[in-house]
């Protein structure tokens, strides 16, 4: 339907490769309906639509792209089956897998064990681990939960506080840039995209990539809208300190 054509054209205009996008004859394009409070906080109602029909066989059609990627990134607005298949292909070819477990749902260990880097917010981290994060000890216990399931790098986004990250060798908070938020819609998505776009394949610049992502998100929350509020790589680079 019209939304599919509009979105694909929008991607092409942004120089995004659309070769592996599939279209459905039976389902409409997924949509998100967003409300924003006066304080800039949002509530999102999602209609999955065609997104929720993606399966392992569909993912196999994109195997070449996965094999050649620096990173494979997924969130939870497609079926778990599809994510697991994409991550299995990635792991088989030495490609780093990154999971943004949003929206917050329970996840099988089979998916977590295929994940190299996980990036939840506090709510999502608590949902997965069952640990209420109230202090640094709770944070470390949450990180250990993910480590025990084979995940090597954990980033927990903390809103205006910044991002807590942990590896087997280091852990601390990377502070956020202090700005006045108008609309927090797309802040998390901006963080993920900016982080991955900056990250070196060997993860050697992990903290730099987090700072860059924090900068990108700080620009997003000062603007209204979802996709329209997301800055370009060039915009973020110009602001990055």
Sequence positions of predicted segments:
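Short beta-strand scaffold segments in enzyme catalytic cores
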Residues: 31-35, 43, 162-166
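Anion (oxyanion) recognition and catalysis
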Residues: 12, 91, 147
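Conserved phosphate-binding/catalytic loop of the ribokinase/pfkB sugar-kinase fold
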Residues: 19-24, 34-71, 76
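Short gly/ser/thr-rich secondary-structure transition/capping motifs
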Residues: 15, 52-57, 97-103
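Conserved beta-alpha-beta core of the PfkB/ribokinase-like small-molecule kinase fold
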Residues: 71-141, 162
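Substrate-binding N-lobe of the ribokinase-like
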Residues: 1-31, 239
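Conserved phosphate-binding/catalytic region of the ribokinase-like
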Residues: 105-110, 136-241
């Amino acid at each position: 339907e019209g939304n599919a054509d509009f979105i694909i054209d929008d991607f092409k205009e942004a120089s995004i490769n659309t070769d592996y996008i599939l279209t459905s004859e039976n389902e409409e394009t997924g949509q998100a309906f967003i409300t924003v409070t006066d304080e800039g906080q949002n509530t999102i109602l999602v209609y999955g639509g065609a997104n929720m029909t993606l399966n392992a066989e569909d993912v196999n059609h994109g195997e070449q792209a996965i094999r050649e990627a620096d990173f494979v990134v997924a969130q939870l607005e497609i079926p778990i089956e599809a994510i697991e298949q994409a991550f299995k292909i990635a792991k088989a070819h030495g490609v780093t897998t990154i999971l943004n477990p949003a929206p917050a749902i329970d996840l099988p260990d089979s998916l977590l064990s295929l994940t190299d880097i996980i990036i939840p917010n506090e709510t999502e981290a608590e949902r997965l681990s069952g640990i209420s994060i109230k202090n640094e000890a709770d944070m470390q216990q949450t990180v250990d939960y993910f480590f025990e399931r084979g995940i090597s790098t954990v980033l927990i986004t903390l809103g205006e506080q910044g991002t807590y990250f942990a590896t087997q060798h280091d852990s601390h908070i990377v502070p956020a840039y202090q700005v006045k938020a108008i609309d927090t819609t797309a802040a998390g998505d901006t963080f993920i995209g900016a982080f991955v776009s900056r990250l070196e394949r060997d993860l050697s610049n992990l903290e730099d990539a987090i700072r860059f992502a924090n900068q990108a998100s700080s620009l997003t929350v000062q603007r209204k809208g979802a996709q329209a509020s997301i800055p370009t790589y060039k915009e973020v680079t110009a602001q990055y300190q």
